[in-house]
Amino acid sequence: MTIVSEIELERIRKLMREAGLGEIKNGINPVTGGLMHKMYRVETAEGIFAVKHLNPEIMKRPSAKDNFARAESLEKILEENKLPIVPAMTIKGMKMQAIDGHYYYIYHWLEGQITDWNTISEKQCYLAGQILGRMHAIDAQNVQKEKPSFMPVDFSSFLDLAGDLKPELKEMLSHHLDELSSVQTSILTAGRELPSMRVISDGDMDPKNVMWQGTTPFVIDLECLDYANPMRSMLELGIQWAGAVTYDFSKEKLLAFFKGYLEKYDNGYRSYEDLYGFVYQNWIEWLEYNLGRAAGKEVSSEEEKQLGESESEKTLKLIHYLSEIEPQVREMLANDLSPVCAQNFDTHDQRLCFFEIMFEGSLEHIPDYPLPEGYRIRAVTVDEAPEKVKQDWIEIEKSAREFETYGQGEEAWNRYYGSRTEMLPGRMFFVEDATGQRVATATAFFDIYGRDQSGAGWLHWVAVRREEQGKGLSKPMIAAVLKRLKELGHFQVKIPTQTTTWLACKVYYDMGFRPIPKNLVSSRAGWKMLEQLAGIRVL
């Protein structure tokens, strides 16, 4: 039985009074609150509440309050989107409450059950996957590629802490050093393969933090809410729900988790097998933290030191188990996930995971494609006002969803053509309808960054206004631009595009263009997406 100090009891009494929740009745009872913080069941005249005392040692960290504040703001977003969560109460405009230098969260008490890790059902995995999918769908964005932040840990250094680790733990750690080195290499590999996306996610949404009222789940303990990569977050949590933590991995449970997730959020990515290294990362970091606790770092009691020892031993065993099941899980991820459904996506869809795609091909034989009646193709002429050309170009690209705002279009125009407007006559083409309105565009150009020294011409910024799509305008326009590139002396063409414009990729493929070999390697996951979205089979 956990004994609560009188000082702690008095702080909680004071907390409830200052929060306006009344005097305590029926005592303050400790309940399971995880490994990091302490939790109490508190009953007052106003109701029953859960009170969480945040770990004082953690709160001393310079970044702690900022991290909690960020989680609180994201928790509010989940509340607004009506996700099934148990949020911290907002009292006097604040979620976190400070009492005598200690920090607390107060929650309405929820009667329910935490499912034992050993008895989780496939249905529960499916429902948990749905919640995570709903969470990720709220604010999913493609973002700039970031350098992986993981720094390998030299676990052998803990063996040098003479007398600080108990002998049994030292021996166990020594036995697993090679394995720890190997899995950290896998983490680094996964970091290089990880596409750059950002979503709201809860990295701690494992079974211990989902409470069930019958068959209805509620996510609790949301302090780990943050922006994260959806593919990594999904894989890490799915593996846990599938039984890996209890050394009883179930392929069926992992597939159920994926099924629920992909029903609520799908960015088209299907190369999760490349990311298995991330399954280890949180456990590597958890092991480092607990070895530190076991060695007496950042602990305030012998009890916490012993907890660090036991958690270190558990984590070493778990990392070993995860390495044993890795081949089985990789095979399942590569072959058994539901395929991407093209009908769920627009022709230009920013919800899709972004990969740069590069086609190339010969300009020796350019096919002819008839332009539908009532349309004509015209190149920009020298007597046209550059501002009008820019305006028409941006409006077409914006209609095709290349940009969300006119300002984004101006930024792209300035980057590609702003200092080169004198080159656009005879290179930039438009399709005009019967009224003379410009409805599609493409440009015969080159690599503006000067990296491509092959002498190939580049096909730039192909776009058709949304209301004109599906009328057969793109292929005749592309053919006209390719012929112009040939007239300019080019024998090859390169076509930069991306997975978010997957239907355009199909057009290029159908016209006979094929991936640049280097891009087929660097964007292999993107080409796998195109295989499922557009039937482009190059892998």
Task: Describe the residue ranges of each PLM region.
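Active-site acidic catalytic loop and adjacent metal/ATP-binding pocket
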Residues: T32, M36-E43, A50-V51, T185-R232
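ATP-binding pocket architecture of kinase catalytic cores
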Residues: A45-V143
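A cross-family kinase active-site recognition segment
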Residues: N118-L173, R198
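Active-site activation/catalytic loop segments of kinase-like enzymes and analogous catalytic loops
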Residues: M231-D266, Y280-V299
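ATP/Mg2+ or Mg2+-diphosphate-binding catalytic cores
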Residues: W286-N344, V538
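A conserved beta-strand-loop-helix scaffold within acyl/acetyltransferase catalytic domains
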Residues: K398-V462
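Conserved acetyl-CoA-binding loop-helix of GNAT-fold acetyltransferases
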Residues: W461-V464, G470-E487, K506-D510
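Conserved GNAT acetyl-CoA-binding A-motif
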Residues: L485-T497
